């Protein structure tokens, strides 16, 4: 019988590479968080996620090991390069920022070289490259020696050890250090751009970059620059956790710079006087001479036009300059709106100045790894939006000036108002009320336990629209509370916009469980606000900017395990989620190039726009919603894309039946933990998540076995409790034949399935659970035979029930 993947690694691959010099201190097992499980309505993760084995080289015993290769194990019965085509090899290498990917069945191995794109023919495992051989090849590829002074930050250990960092954060940090070292060897400007999805820890990366540079003795003074007060507050706290009093906020106090004596300066564009292209950078010039900083980190540079931060970079041209962005490098917007063109200019500026990102970790990968919440989309269309509103319809309904309440004439009204003008030029209270009722109803029905008390952000068209939506949601909530006879948790809905000093309520939105559930905003909450408990994002405004859209989606992507929030729902009434599918590719300006020259200068200043005309308000329309389907955001070819749930289920089913053609084959593999992990990994690596399917189908009371068997093989699903009862009924004869204490123990063990499903049966502490211990525990089970064998028989009978 051939060895499984896990046994192949342990019994064949590990001994072979140990013999070639890859001892345990040079092998790092990177374990992702794993798929989300929900048991008894609370979130928990599978016991483990994907385990990636990286090979690392160490210059000496005191230095930080540097990952240079990934090694994948295959079943002994499979070809050594099974599944490792060029695309998958490049994806794996890029994900971990390594140069080499190896694949082996324990006897032979193949190698993918990221720099050449070539995959070797199978070779005997005894010829696996040694650490010295791979180091020499690595140094040739990256363009510097690990003994060079420029490589010192790369070899400097994490200050607090490696326990807190995630694999992609380490990959990003190494990518920056490699780029800076290579630039030093080539005498090029040391610039690097990182692209990571919102919620994946860009601030953590920035802190550890600067800490390791400081510990390497190469940090003189650093500037951490951001464009929002909230980001500055978060950044300052993070930097002070790492640097203590050596990190300080930049502001003027009595004519002096508060951060004067600090090594790490945390500032906003506004503080430096560069928040506008025609701003006065007097603070910058007054307190910071040229080349004052040795290192500059620009946070969220995807929101900042070149004219805003160029003066900081040009005055510190010798500094190591690092840009952080949450915008996908490949954005191709087919809609040539002004907002999309502005996005294109910003992206082009970033790519032109910094060059291509040295590392990317997108929304799709983060969701697949379990670091960001899964996303469901509920798409709907408003009937008025589909057709527009005509002059005749408005005139027949007594239109008024929205500011004065006075009647308006036909001459003051356009012939046709289209959807993008709703709630800006034409206010439609009936539309607002209908959309709010639909959203409120869906929120209440989505979670019977929480009901309307779910943190939600609604993006509105204008400040007044945000007022109207907040009022409508408060009215609906008050009516709901009255109908249920429950006390209100006020304030329930509130406006959170720049004009309303919306930041004042952010702590309550973030932390309160008894108020501030619905935030209505225009764009204040697009960025810089960390509210992990947000479960719903609603689009009541039409979106044209891909950058803004991704930032808005980012408000919901954080996982919040203390509250059980593992997925979030997007309620899309305006087609905003179409921007998930945009590629949005922009080209750098033709002048200069290569990420080495200065960015483009600011363009001509447009004249100020004329004051807006007062909007028209009109009542009396019949408004209804048309559901357009449910979607789940899934990784498709490395990109986060909305997939219709029926298509998602069909794809998952096809992948499962490819792995296990029959229910019997599925059941036989499911009861074997390593085989079960292989099934799950095969599904997840294809872009599907069984646990997400369970959440979408609202089957939280079912074990994954029943969820998958129902989908792929038509098995009538049983809840965990029903399956436990069926086990006792269908196998009553087998149970009755056992010694009484053994029978009671097995029944107590079976009850653990009702609580925790498959993993409940395999809990290593199952013998210490009060019910099992009280029934006699492992000692009682021995009267029925070898406990391990009896437990396996129990599992087999449980899933055959």
Located regions from the model:
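Conserved C-terminal RecA-like helicase domain
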Residues: 263, 415-521
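Long, largely alpha-helical accessory region at the distal end of helicase-like NTP-driven motors
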Residues: 158-162, 175, 412-424, 434, ...
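Conserved helix-turn-beta segment of the N-terminal RecA-like "Helicase ATP-binding" lobe
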Residues: 229-253, 472-481
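Conserved helicase ATPase motor motifs in RecA-like P-loop NTPase domains
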Residues: 197-198, 300-303, 315-334, 370
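Interdomain helical connector at the RecA1-RecA2 junction of SF1/SF2 helicase-like NTPases
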Residues: 336-453
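SF2 helicase catalytic motif II
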Residues: 284-323
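ATP-dependent helicase/translocase motor core
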Residues: 1-221, 230-246, 260-264, 270, ...
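Conserved RecA-like P-loop NTPase helicase motor core
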Residues: 77, 99, 270-271, 295, ...
């Amino acid at each position: 019988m051939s060895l499984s993947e896990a046994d192949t690694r342990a019994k064949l691959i590990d001994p072979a590479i140990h013999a070639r010099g890859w001892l345990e201190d040079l092998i790092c097992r990177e374990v992702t968080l794993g798929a989300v499980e929900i048991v008894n309505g609370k979130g928990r993760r599978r016991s483990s996620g994907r385990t990636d084995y990286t090979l690392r080289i160490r210059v000496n015993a005191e230095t930080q090991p540097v990952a240079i290769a990934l090694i994948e194990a295959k079943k002994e019965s499979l070809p050594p390069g099974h599944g490792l085509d060029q695309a998958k090899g490049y994806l794996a290498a890029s994900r971990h920022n390594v140069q080499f990917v190896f694949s082996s069945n324990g006897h032979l191995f193949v190698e993918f070289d990221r720099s050449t794109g070539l995959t070797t023919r199978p070779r005997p495992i005894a010829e696996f490259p040694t650490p010295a051989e791979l180091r020499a090849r690595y140094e040739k590829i990256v363009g510097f020696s690990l003994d060079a002074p420029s490589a010192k930050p790369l070899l400097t250990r994490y200050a607090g050890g490696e326990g807190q960092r995630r694999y992609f954060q380490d990959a990003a940090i190494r990518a920056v250090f490699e780029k800076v070292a290579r630039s030093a060897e080539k005498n090029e400007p040391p610039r690097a751009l990182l692209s990571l999805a919102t919620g994946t820890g860009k601030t953590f990366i920035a802190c550890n970059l600067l800490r390791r540079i400081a510990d390497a003795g190469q940090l003189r003074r650093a500037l951490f620059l951001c464009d929002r007060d909230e980001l500055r507050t978060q950044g300052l706290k993070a930097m002070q956790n790492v640097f203590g009093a050596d990190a300080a906020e930049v502001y003027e106090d009595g004519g002096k710079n508060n951060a004067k004596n600090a090594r790490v300066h945390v500032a906003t564009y506004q503080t430096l006087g560069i928040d506008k292209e025609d701003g006065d950078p007097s603070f910058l010039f007054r307190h910071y001479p040229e080349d004052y900083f040795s290192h500059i980190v620009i946070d969220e540079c995807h929101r900042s036009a070149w004219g805003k931060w160029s003066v900081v970079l040009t005055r510190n041209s010798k500094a190591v300059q690092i840009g952080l962005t949450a915008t996908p490098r490949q954005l191709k917007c087919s809609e040539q709106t002004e907002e999309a063109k502005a996005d294109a200019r910003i992206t082009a500026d970033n790519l032109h100045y910094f060059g291509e990102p040295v590392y990317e970790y997108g929304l799709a990968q983060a969701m697949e790894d379990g670091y960001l919440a899964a996303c469901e989309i509920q798409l709907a269309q408003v009937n008025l939006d589909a057709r527009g509103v005509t002059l005749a319809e408005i005139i027949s309904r007594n239109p008024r000036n929205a500011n004065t309440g006075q009647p308006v004439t036909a001459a003051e009204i356009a012939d046709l108002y289209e959807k993008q003008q709703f709630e800006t030029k034409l206010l439609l209270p009936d539309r607002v009320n209908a959309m709010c009722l639909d959203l409120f109803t869906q929120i209440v029905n989505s979670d019977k336990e929480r009901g309307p008390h779910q943190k939600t952000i609604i993006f509105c068209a204008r400040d007044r629209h945000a007022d109207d939506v907040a009022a409508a949601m408060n009215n609906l909530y008050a009516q709901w509370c009255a109908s249920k006879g429950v006390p209100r948790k006020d304030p329930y809905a509130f406006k959170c916009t720049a004009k309303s000093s919306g930041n004042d309520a952010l702590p309550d939105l973030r932390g309160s469980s008894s108020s501030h559930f619905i935030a209505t905003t225009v764009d204040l909450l697009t960025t810089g606000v960390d509210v992990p408990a947000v479960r719903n994002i609603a689009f009541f405004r039409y979106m044209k900017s891909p950058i803004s859209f991704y930032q808005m989606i980012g408000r919901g992507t954080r996982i919040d395990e203390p509250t059980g929030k593992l997925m979030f729902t997007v309620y899309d009434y305006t087609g905003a989620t179409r921007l998930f599918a945009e590629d949005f590719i922009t080209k750098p300006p033709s002048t200069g190039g290569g990420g080495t020259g200065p960015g483009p200068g600011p363009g001509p200043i447009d004249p100020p726009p004329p004051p807006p005309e007062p909007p028209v308000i009109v009542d009396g329309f019949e408004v209804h919603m048309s559901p357009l389907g449910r979607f789940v955001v899934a990784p498709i070819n490395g990109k986060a894309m909305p997939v219709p749930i029926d298509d998602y289920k069909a794809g998952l089913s096809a992948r499962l039946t490819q792995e296990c053609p029959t229910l019997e084959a599925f059941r036989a593999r499911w009861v074997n933990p390593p085989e079960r992990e292989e099934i799950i990994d095969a599904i997840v690596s294809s872009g599907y998540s069984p646990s997400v399917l369970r959440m979408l189908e609202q089957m939280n009371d079912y074990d994954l076995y029943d969820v998958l068997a129902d989908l792929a093989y038509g098995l009538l699903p049983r809840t965990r409790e029903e399956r436990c009862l069926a086990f006792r009924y269908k196998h009553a004869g087998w149970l009755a034949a056992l010694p009484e204490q053994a029978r009671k123990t097995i029944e107590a063990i079976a009850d653990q399935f009702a609580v925790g499903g498959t993993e409940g049966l395999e809990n290593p502490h199952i013998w210490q659970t009060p019910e099992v211990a009280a029934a006699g525990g492992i000692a009682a089970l021995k009267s029925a035979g070898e406990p391990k064998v009896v437990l396996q028989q129990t599992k087999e009978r449980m899933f055959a029930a």
